[in-house]
Amino acid sequence: MASAFRSSTRLILVLGILILCSVSSVRSWSKEGHILTCRIAQNLLEAGPAHVVENLLPDYVKGDLSALCVWPDQIRHWYKYRWTSHLHYIDTPDQACSYEYSRDCHDQHGLKDMCVDGAIQNFTSQLQHYGEGTSDRRYNMTEALLFLSHFMGDIHQPMHVGFTSDEGGNTIDLRWYKHKSNLHHVWDREIILTALKENYDKNLDLLQEDLEKNITNGLWHDDLSSWTECNDLIACPHKYASESIKLACKWGYKGVKSGETLSEEYFNTRLPIVMKRIVQGGVRLAMILNRVFSDDHAIAGVAAT
């Protein structure tokens, strides 16, 4: 799989931003979900890793990782990046409610490692070699950073590790309050957008502030050590995927039938799960970046650019 993870030029990266608002929603957290995950992660970076991340980002985003966290969704259908379209999710056997890497991490042709878990492993491995690259290293590592940041959001969205037959809920059509949607989109965006509208006056900054307060001294403070426990950076995404399929079974699929209307009861009971997974994605992304960019080689890589 590593040979497939190719690099691009700055031009391609810029063009990805230009089409940011023109691509329809696909299998991924909403724009807001990814922005929150990346903002939370960047705010938890130590000084050295934060400097490396800022150095890898193109100048026009002014050091803001969240400005590019949706980029992998925007380019997934381009010919050059079509191979990445299967890296955003994992299809598991219907009703198994479990995840096994050897069984489930492959694309529709059976090519191994082509899933969001395999992608996180690959891009983490690339970033671990940041201080050892050639003169064009910056472009390779920029893409690796953006893909890793995005996929860490995706793997924490429970319906991204869903059942094969319904494509993670994409084919379960229903209504969200008064408009048409599907179960996957409910978890990708509907719950987040409803929370923003009803609780935060559509202000993403207020929602972010609320989430971060619960990290520092609130609801999740005592959970941080267990969330970031990881003896092997390459293997830890297995755990994140397993968490997601269990949540998909318990909270996503449970009690839902095609054609029905989901509204207040579903929103109120599932909102805490969605918020927690967004935060876990950010906390764990920060953990990975702090570890891969913490050594002298990584800092030397910044000085060399």
From Swiss-Prot:
Keywords: Calcium, Disulfide bond, Endonuclease, Glycoprotein, Hydrolase, Manganese, Metal-binding, Nuclease, Signal
Binding of a divalent metal cation 1, residues: D73, H88, H150, D154
Residues noted as binding substrate in the record, renumbered to the chain: 29-34, 73-79, 88-91, 98-103, 122, 139
Gene Ontology annotations of biological process type: DNA catabolic process; floral organ senescence; leaf senescence
InterPro entries: PLipase_C/P1_nuclease_dom_sf, S1/P1nuclease
pH behavior: Optimum pH is 8 with RNA, ssDNA and dsDNA as substrates.
Cofactor comment text: Binds 3 divalent metal cations. Uses Ca(2+) ions with ssDNA as substrate. Can also use Mn(2+) with lower efficiency with ssDNA and dsDNA as substrates.
Cleaved propeptide residues: 287-305
Entry protein name: Endonuclease 1
Organism: Arabidopsis thaliana (Mouse-ear cress)
Lineage of origin: Eukaryota, Viridiplantae, Streptophyta, Embryophyta, Tracheophyta
